[in-house]
C-alpha cells in the first residue's frame, strides 16, 4: 500500500512539474495578451489547463456587459480560441472595480498556504459579496480560498483531499 502511495505521489508531482514546464510564456504575459486584445476590462478568471493535448491559459475578461473568454497557447502565446458574450449584470458594475487586485488575492492565498502552487482564480459574486475564488495545490490536497475582493479578508478556507 505504501508503494502505491509513493508511486502516486511521484506521478502527481511529475504531472504538476510538467504542467509548469510546458508553459513557455508566463502567467503575466498571458494576462497581458488577453487584456491587449480585449482593449481593457477586468480579468475575472484565470488558469493553466490542458486542452486537446496542449497547454493553454484560460482567461476570462469582463468589460461592462461584455464577457470574453480566451484560450492562449502556453507555448506560443497565440490566441487559439475567443468567445464573446453579452452578459446582463444588472446595475452591479462592481465586478469591474474590486478594491483588492487579482495579484493581491493570489498573494493572500499563497501566504496562507503551506508550500502551495497556484492553480486558478476567479472573480465572482457569492451570496451578494464580490469574492476571489482561489485554488491552490498542496501536494495531494487542493485548497480553495474565498477572499473578499474589497477587504482582502479570507471568508472561507476549504480543503479537498
Question: PLM features: what roles do these ranges have?
Answer:
Residues 1-161:
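Long, terminal "pre-/pro-" and other extracytoplasmic accessory regions
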Amino acid at each position: 500500500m505504501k508503494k502505491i502511495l509513493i508511486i502516486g505521489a511521484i506521478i502527481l508531482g511529475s504531472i504538476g512539474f510538467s504542467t509548469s514546464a510546458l508553459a513557455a510564456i508566463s502567467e503575466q504575459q498571458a494576462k497581458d495578451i488577453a487584456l491587449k486584445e480585449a482593449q481593457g476590462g477586468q480579468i475575472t478568471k484565470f488558469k493553466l489547463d490542458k486542452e486537446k493535448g496542449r497547454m493553454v491559459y484560460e482567461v476570462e475578461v469582463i468589460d461592462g456587459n461584455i464577457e470574453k473568454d480566451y484560450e492562449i497557447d502556453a507555448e506560443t502565446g497565440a490566441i487559439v480560441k475567443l468567445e464573446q458574450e453579452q452578459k446582463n449584470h444588472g446595475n452591479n458594475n462592481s465586478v469591474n472595480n474590486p478594491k483588492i487586485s487579482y495579484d493581491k488575492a493570489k498573494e493572500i492565498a499563497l501566504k496562507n498556504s503551506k508550500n502551495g502552487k497556484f492553480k486558478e482564480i476567479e472573480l465572482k459574486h457569492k451570496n451578494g459579496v464580490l469574492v476571489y475564488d482561489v485554488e491552490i495545490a498542496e501536494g495531494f490536497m487542493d485548497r480553495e480560498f474565498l477572499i473578499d475582493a474589497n477587504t482582502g479578508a479570507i471568508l472561507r478556507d476549504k480543503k479537498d483531499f
